[in-house]
Amino acid sequence: MAAKASFNWIDPLLLDQQLTEEERMVRDSAEQFAADKLAPRVLEAFRHEKTDPAIFREMGETGLLGATIPEAYGGSGLNYVCYGLIAREVERIDSGYRSMMSVQSSLVMVPINEFGSEATKQKYLSLIHI
């Protein structure tokens, strides 16, 4: 009789082994940011029913906003796997901040990058990630 395979509770879909080294580094950085910078402030924000805008400046400075935007426009130039990993780590702490991050990164920055003129990209993309 064959031995039963063990279930990996930390990585049930075995995604980690499919990631590149860069993707793991991005995930780990996002996890660290979420644990160190986001988590301690979320409870306080809930208690006072407010959002801390400084978190978004810090996300931009860390390269978590506009992750797929080319570096030439102030983004991180990462792939969409990295973007998904960043979103997952922020979501793990708070879905509201992840939603705001996604709106800024995907619904605002991506259309400007994909469809904006060079002048529009130069004018806005380097500003909105911080």
Regions found by a protein language model. Name each.
Residues 2-6, 27-32:
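Short, flexible segments with low predicted structural confidence
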